[in-house]
Amino acid sequence: MIGGEFNTPADWIRSGNIMPIIDDFTAAHGGKAPILVFVDSGGSFNNDTECVNGPRGNAADHLTKDVRPYVISQFGASSAPADWGVEGWSMGGTCAIDLTVMHPDLFSTFVDIAGDHGPTAGTKDQTIERLYGGDAAQWAAYDPATVMRAHGPYGGVSGWFEDTAEPVGAKANSAQHGARPQSASPLGFGGHDDWR
């Protein structure tokens, strides 16, 4: 579970109020619950890494090469991608889809709560400079839409986008695929950043 910029892993517990949800799930499943990991993707309160490798840190490598193997070795977690998901809020939501589409060999499920359409730190040019040290090829390597087009159809991968704002272009994009954007939020659409 990955928070946004200006968040800490503890925010899932404090402001996210996740403990009653975990307790209810555990009670409903005979005392069994998933291993939940509240990760720090930035190393500090205001380091907006967007979970990429770049001048702000090697966050992608930290999450895929340090955190995941550690959880497997220290907690006996399964290494099967079908048993791994990434959930995130804001920047963490962007991280969730990015990590999953880039590493379907590691993660099979994501929940993107109010994430951006891709790693973002200003305009596209500003993002390339700030997150990738000016390397435009790295921007493309971490852009979810570019990654998905290059990968082709995914098998065994699923995701959930939760936002109170209808994603820009969602109606046109989903219409050509026979679907329409929906919100599971009791508030409907209207809120934070949008995935498109």
Where does each model-flagged region fall?
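Non-catalytic cap/lid and distal C-terminal segments of serine-dependent acyl enzymes
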Residues: M1-R196
